[in-house]
Curated annotation (Swiss-Prot):
Substrate binds at residues 42, 110-112. InterPro entries: Janus, Janus_sf. The active site is at 69 (proton acceptor). JanA and janB regulate somatic sex differentiation. It comes from the Eukaryota. PANTHER family: BCDNA.GH02250-RELATED (PTHR12258:SF5), JANUS-A/JANUS-B (PTHR12258). GO terms for biological process: cell differentiation; sex differentiation. This is Sex-regulated protein janus-B. Changing residue 72 to V: In strain: kenya_2. GO terms for molecular function: protein histidine phosphatase activity. Pfam families: Ocnus (PF05005).
């Protein structure tokens, strides 16, 4: 009988942890993997994760027509910090996005954050439904 009473306490113990993990994961999965604009832009390859859970992250691509890569990073932080999501920059470069011709060219490096793995960026873009039919070239 004592064992059954002990087992009845398990849902009360597990429930707060379950809510914490599930809401954090929902926030993480809700972040779009790709946001790039039309034309020639700077871009960042970013690993995002919930605070304290660096092992369970995902990689996103963010690009914009700005003066430097730091401006992109600032916009990423403004987007993610209210959700409790942390960001680690993996590198940066440039993207030439031509949606009319269905072509994307990935090249260059970021002076601030170093070079990104352009092949990984290409794979993320190809997995995204918007850019699935695009011809994506990588120049190291």
């Amino acid at each position: 009988m004592k064992m059954f009473k002990s087992l009845s306490l398990i849902p009360r113990i597990v429930s707060p942890f379950q809510k914490c993990y599930s809401t954090d994961l929902i926030n993480l999965v809700g972040v779009p993997r790709v946001k790039i604009t039309k034309g020639q832009n700077r871009y960042l390859l970013v690993n995002i994760h919930t605070h304290g859970f660096t092992k369970y992250g995902r990689v996103i691509v963010r690009g914009a027509d700005v003066d430097n890569h730091l401006a992109i990073f600032d916009s990423i932080l403004e987007e993610l910090e209210p959700e409790g999501i942390c960001a680690k920059i993996l590198g940066g470069g440039r993207i030439l996005n031509e949606p009319d011709n269905k072509k994307i060219k990935i090249y260059g490096t970021s002076r601030t954050f170093g070079g990104a793995d352009h092949t990984r960026t290409r794979n993320i873009l190809q997995a995204w439904t918007t850019y699935k039919d695009f011809k994506i070239t990588v120049k190291q």
